[in-house]
């Protein structure tokens, strides 16, 4: 029972911090993880529910590009790589790292090229 009260306190504290500043202290401690978990669903939502697309892309191309960005973010998380691509083999560190780096590089290539197009 006591742990529930303590958990409720910390959860409320994080919510107040996010309301005041837009982020909680715990978000900063693990910034890359917070970014992945926040941006991936946003990009997936945008790929399925956008109003318009940039003039240099067709609707299908823009949707595919947004999905590719979201997929790259998904595979920048080592747990997703291990569970989904490496069949749960936690000992394949080098391969996991290479997959994560490849997705990192591709994500930031797409993200930097289309940063100002991420609107709806």
Give the positions of each predicted feature.
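Long, non-globular targeting/processing and low-complexity regions
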Residues: 1-120
